[in-house]
């Protein structure tokens, strides 16, 4: 058999003048070599053959074929179908890519000597599949209609630790679901979210991605996340923990993000090893953002430093007891866009501490300098704006409704007016001083304190 395979290799080498690619198939992995990449084909007796610096044991080769197809250099294509998965690796990087397939579970390790970035295209459907990748180079991941449900870990786990470009291919629907059999208290990355990224990721493409975080988060990212202009739709349909759990910083420039979570909607943690100016910040500059959370003592959006909102259409609805809409230890600056925040829970006691359902909470200044800001904080002790420092109404259109009053600084550049003991019915429209806010059906307050500035 080995001699037959060797003969086939020789025939492939000399008999494919009109063809374009030599496919070497080992199990579920195909290595695709162009004609010029087979010039240095070398045999070691009848045991192995080396093509483009990758050695193959002849006994491991299932099939060889010369096909009239092209494959781009520096690419890896992964296709799922039910309980199986197939991988095609471009020949020029064959020596650097080690790929394994078990059923529909794919593991790819890129060698540290890999000279260039690789583009991975992932597509297909599996109800019992996953994708894992590790390496040392920046990478591009094209989600080209990928639906994965992994019973016992993250559906997609990228561990390269470098710049990762995530592309939602135009017109595609992608869905990742992690497993209910995972251990929620397991500290390993594979159990942190439906999608795990160890690296800094930048997102683009007009497609759609839906995440189902049945164990913890929808997305866990160990470094910054940037959502670029023109991005399509990212939906966290469910998350037992946080919708988006991001380290370093989160920046949204565009796209549409919808989050439904029991934990925090977006949680941004500062990274001790980061020297980025934005470390710990949550930055919203554009796009459409909708967050709904329902847990006790959680936040719609929180971060470890400043929160900066300069654009976009942003809606944060928080229904859990003791939970807040926006929360940051640093300053919260709103300079543009339209932001609506609603909290409806009651005061809660957590570990002996009283937690109040405020709308916007900062340990530093809250500056409302532009855009539109509408806040309806819980009638049970919630303030629209609560701070340990100062509130400034510096030019934004503001209406803040709460169970307790919010009082801006006298140093504010724009005047403000306060009203008290106002009956705000569920779903009603509240208008004062030319500012109008239609509160949702889930909110009511029979003795509201209202702040208005324009």
What are these regions (language model features)?
Residues 55-60, 390-393:
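Extracellular interaction modules
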Residues 4-13:
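Sec-dependent N-terminal signal peptides
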Residues 34-43, 57-69:
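Structured surface patches comprising rigid loops and adjacent beta-strands/short helices at the edges
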Residues 69-454:
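A composition-driven surface/loop motif
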Residues 20-22, 45-48, 115-122:
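Short, hydrophobic/aromatic-rich segments at coil-to-beta transitions
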Residues 15-19:
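Sec/Tat signal peptide C-region and signal peptidase I cleavage site
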């Amino acid at each position: 058999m080995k001699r037959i395979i060797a003969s086939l290799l020789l025939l492939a080498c000399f008999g494919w003048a009109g063809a374009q690619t030599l496919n070497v198939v080992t199990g579920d992995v195909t290595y695709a070599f162009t004609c010029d990449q087979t010039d240095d084909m070398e045999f070691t007796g009848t045991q192995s053959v080396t093509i483009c610096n990758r050695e193959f044991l002849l006994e491991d080769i299932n099939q060889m074929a010369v096909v009239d197809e092209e494959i781009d250099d520096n690419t890896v294509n992964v296709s799922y179908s039910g309980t199986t998965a197939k991988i095609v690796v471009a020949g020029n990087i064959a020596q650097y890519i080690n790929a394994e397939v078990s059923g529909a579970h794919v593991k790819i390790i890129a060698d540290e000597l890999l000279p260039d970035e690789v583009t991975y295209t992932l597509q297909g459907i599996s109800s019992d599949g996953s994708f894992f990748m590790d390496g040392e180079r920046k990478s591009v991941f094209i989600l080209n209609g990928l639906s994965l449900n992994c019973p016992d870990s993250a559906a997609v786990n990228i561990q390269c630790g470098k710049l990762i470009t995530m592309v939602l291919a135009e017109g595609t629907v992608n869905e990742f679901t992690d497993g209910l059999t995972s251990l929620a208290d397991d500290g390993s990355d594979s159990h942190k979210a439906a999608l795990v990224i160890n690296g800094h990721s930048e997102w683009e493409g007009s497609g759609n991605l839906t995440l189902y975080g049945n164990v913890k988060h929808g997305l866990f990212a160990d470094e910054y996340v940037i959502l670029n202009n023109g991005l399509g739709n990212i939906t966290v349909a469910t998350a037992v923990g946080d919708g988006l759990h991001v380290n370093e910083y989160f920046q949204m420039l565009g796209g549409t993000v919808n989050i439904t979570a029991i934990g925090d909607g977006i949680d941004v943690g500062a990274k001790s090893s980061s020297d980025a100016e934005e470390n710990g910040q949550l930055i919203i500059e554009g796009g459409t953002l909708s967050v709904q959370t329902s847990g006790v003592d959680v936040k719609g959006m929180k971060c470890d430093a400043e929160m900066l909102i300069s654009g976009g259409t942003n809606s944060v609805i928080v229904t859990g007891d003791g939970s807040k809409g926006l929360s940051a230890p640093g300053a919260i600056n709103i300079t543009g866009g339209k932001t609506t925040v609603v909290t409806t829970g009651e005061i809660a006691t957590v570990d002996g501490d009283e937690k109040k359902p405020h709308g916007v909470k900062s340990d530093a200044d809250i500056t409302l300098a532009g855009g539109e800001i509408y806040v309806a904080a819980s009638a049970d002790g919630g303030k629209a704006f609560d701070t340990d420092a100062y509130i400034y109404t510096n030019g934004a259109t503001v209406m803040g409704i709460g169970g307790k009053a919010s009082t801006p600084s006298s140093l504010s550049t724009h005047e403000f007016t306060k009203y008290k003991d106002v009956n705000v019915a569920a779903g009603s429209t509240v208008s004062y001083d030319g500012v109008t806010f239609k509160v949702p059906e889930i909110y009511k307050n029979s003795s509201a304190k209202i702040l208005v500035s324009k």
